[in-house]
């Protein structure tokens, strides 16, 4: 896989309400039905924090800004976000990145 400077990386930090991390993770899995159909989405990986079961991280990698925008403005995205609300313990934080180099890219 060739890496271009137009590639967009994103790390999302999702704090779950106390004791709701596993429920948030389960609810989040609904995204994969849609993400698996997105041609410009290279990686979309859900993680649980190794030291805090109520903190989830999502690593996302897109072909370009257009693919990232298409993902975040997709028809399914807003209702999906609302479906996570009962399990959230705070606002998600998003960190946009420009990948430089790495194994697997």
Where in this protein do the model-derived segments appear?
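Short glycine-rich loop/turn motifs that provide flexible caps or phosphate-binding loops at active sites
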Residues: 8, 18, 39
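An amphipathic, aromatic/His-enriched active-site/gating alpha helix that lines ligand/cofactor pockets
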Residues: 30-42, 61-95
């Amino acid at each position: 896989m060739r890496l271009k400077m137009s590639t967009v990386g994103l790390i999302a930090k999702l704090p779950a309400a106390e004791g709701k991390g596993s429920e948030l993770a389960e609810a989040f899995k609904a995204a994969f039905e849609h993400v698996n159909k997105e041609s410009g989405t290279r990686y979309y990986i859900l993680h649980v924090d190794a030291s805090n079961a109520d903190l989830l991280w999502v690593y996302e990698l897109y072909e370009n800004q257009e693919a990232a925008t298409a993902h975040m403005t997709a028809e399914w995205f807003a209702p999906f976000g609302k479906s996570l609300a009962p399990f959230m313990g705070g606002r998600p934080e998003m960190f946009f990145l420009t990948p430089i180099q790495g194994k697997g890219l």
